[in-house]
């Protein structure tokens, strides 16, 4: 389960106008959409590749639709993720891994002619680990059929530090096509 508990934002008047939003800053507290995901490992091999499939659904429960923060539409997606260690230390505390993703993404739109948009999703990236630190970088996006801003490409980076079952995460995302925005986030993850 993934959920944006609280978001505070600030954007320029130009960005507000491009998004047809009302405010440039968050005037009230609000919550984000809820995403429920299931992951299934279908192959685990040191010699070949590891492979997982996932099924995901996003609710339409987020707030501040008037400021283009979340959507009032559900979506779902399925994907296959494969990865392989390119290098691993003898003690297993350090590694470099390559991974790739391909899938299908579907979401509801507010277009009266095309009530739904579908896309092929893709991604490729690398992950480096050293003791409790993990640095991941990848290039990912999807390719929708309407070609109306539905073909974004993002360069995503994530630095995490794990202490026992607690993870502190810092993320940076750079939009390269259709979604030309910079995003920074700080997160806490509790592993059960």
Task: List where the protein language model places each region.
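Transmembrane beta-barrel domains of Gram-negative outer membranes and organellar outer membranes
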Residues: 1-58, 78-89, 133-137, 165
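Sequence/structural signature of outer-membrane beta-barrel proteins
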Residues: 4-8, 43-45, 57-67, 85-89, ...
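Outer membrane beta-barrel transmembrane domains
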Residues: 10-23, 111-116, 120-192
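Transmembrane beta-barrel strands of outer-membrane/channel proteins
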Residues: 1-3, 51-59, 96-106, 124, ...
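Detector for outer-membrane/organellar transmembrane beta-barrel domains
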Residues: 71-144
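Flexible, glycine/proline-enriched loop segments at strand-loop-helix junctions
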Residues: 24-25, 65-69
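"Short basic amphipathic alpha-helical interaction patches in structured regions
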Residues: 52-54, 67-71
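Weak global preference for isoleucine
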Residues: 28, 34-36, 53, 57, ...
